[in-house]
């Protein structure tokens, strides 16, 4: 089966192909003979009921510095494609939300991965609250009294913006921390939505495990270990990728979360687990495929495309 695939992503010239999961998906699609077209989300337009974009034919190569070739832009209706990959990175802002409304108009006749309505309705730090039994104690609030009561009960906490990404603006706040007042003021000015306050898990120094689920099933995992002088394990923040196996607790988490993802059309998802605690469910633009492959793990990109092809064959 040969599919006509469009990818909605950030500028391809700027990606780091060594760690980029979108690039891994494109390489696998090309290997299977699928046609690739590219556009950036700012190019989407709706004219009446028609969703259009100036798409460019795309060829990819696993060669740093020379990893793609683009054809000339050609205005096309996106409902003429078999598949659209929704792969731009956050921020999960109004521009991102608007693009999900646009893409919802063509899905599922054109298969959008992930389902745009479900992406919109499942922000990673909110959707995870559907599974409190799997999480560390967590508060979502910007109310000072609520935050202080939570800190009094749980001691050291991590404080981060609700719609942040990539480890940006993540802080550990210790009990009686003299910086908390200034941090609260800074968050109040900078982030207008509520914030995430979560009990600090000291075992994060041993790693934050990124587990990939494809159509609700375990597909691969990588342990991300923070640098000695940093709290954050994100690989874009200097975290080191290590080979890993799932614990029984982590398999339980996958078995609990997986059906909810499958029901919502969330085909490619990354969940984050620290010491057996589920902390995030990433449905927008999950990463980890290339690190898992580099460490000798499963071919996650192949599993994603196997699943897409099966869905398009029905």
Swiss-Prot record:
Binding-site residues, Mg(2+): 280, 282
Cofactor needs: Mg(2+); Mn(2+)
GO MF terms, alphabetically ordered: ATP binding; glutathione synthase activity; metal ion binding
Signal peptide region: none
Keywords from the UniProt entry: ATP-binding, Glutathione biosynthesis, Ligase, Magnesium, Manganese, Metal-binding, Nucleotide-binding
UniProt EC number: 6.3.2.3
Gene3D superfamilies according to UniProt: 3.40.50.20, ATP-grasp fold, A domain (3.30.1490.20), ATP-grasp fold, B domain (3.30.470.20)
Cofactor info, note text: Binds 1 Mg(2+) or Mn(2+) ion per subunit.
Pathway as given in its UniProt record: Sulfur metabolism; glutathione biosynthesis; glutathione from L-cysteine and L-glutamate: step 2/2
Cellular component GO terms, alphabetical: cytoplasm
Matching Pfam families: GSH-S_ATP, GSH-S_N
Binding site for ATP: 151-207
SUPFAM superfamilies: Glutathione synthetase ATP-binding domain-like, PreATP-grasp domain
Domain ATP-grasp: 125-309
Record InterPro entries: ATP-grasp, ATP_grasp_subdomain_1, Glut_synth_pro, GSHS_ATP-bd, GSHS_N, PreATP-grasp_dom_sf
Catalytic activity: gamma-L-glutamyl-L-cysteine + glycine + ATP = glutathione + ADP + phosphate + H(+)
NCBIfam families per the UniProt record, alphabetical: glut_syn (TIGR01380), PRK05246.1 (NF003573)
Family: Belongs to the prokaryotic GSH synthase family.
Name of this protein: Glutathione synthetase
Gene that specifies this protein: gshB
